[in-house]
Amino acid sequence: MAPKRSRRSNRRAGSRAAATSLVYDTCYATLTERATTSFQRQSFPTLKGMGDRAFQVVSFTIQGVSAAPLMYNARLYNPGDTDSVHATGVQLMGTVPRTVRLTPRVGQNNWFFGNTEEAETILAIDGLVSAKGANAPSNTVVVTGCFRLAPSELQSQ
């Protein structure tokens, strides 16, 4: 008679690590020609309300619409970096809404600490050249960020 096999359990013994959660947050901005619009933690209402929880950028979706064509470039930053780590390249915004997705490259997706300075830039969008020149109407962008939040147990003290 063959020995009896025990059933294996997929459950781990002991405590499990706290899971991270994904949060989508949206903010609105106006781009102007030859100017940079910066987005910080305080720009996103949900991140601002999370207190000192650390977060990681998963992706940004930028949707822009403008009465006159406007070229722009979006840049993504890592914590503490003064130079961008990834960019969309030159994009064109016009009367038809266009969506561009910006994700960090592998190895460049670092955590922003919970006590991130209010002035630390996460995303910057440069308005480059408009077809109307100085008389260009406002150019609206909707920026939706997907962020990974650290577990609340790991909040900064």
From Swiss-Prot:
Domain of life: Viruses
Entries under Gene3D superfamilies matching the protein: Satellite virus coat domain
Pfam families hit by this protein: Potex_coat (PF06184)
The protein, known as: Coat protein
GO MF term list: structural molecule activity
Cellular-component GO terms for this entry: viral capsid
Localisation per UniProt entry: Virion
InterPro entries found in the cross-reference section: Satellite_virus_coat, Satellite_virus_coat_sf
Keywords: Capsid protein, Virion
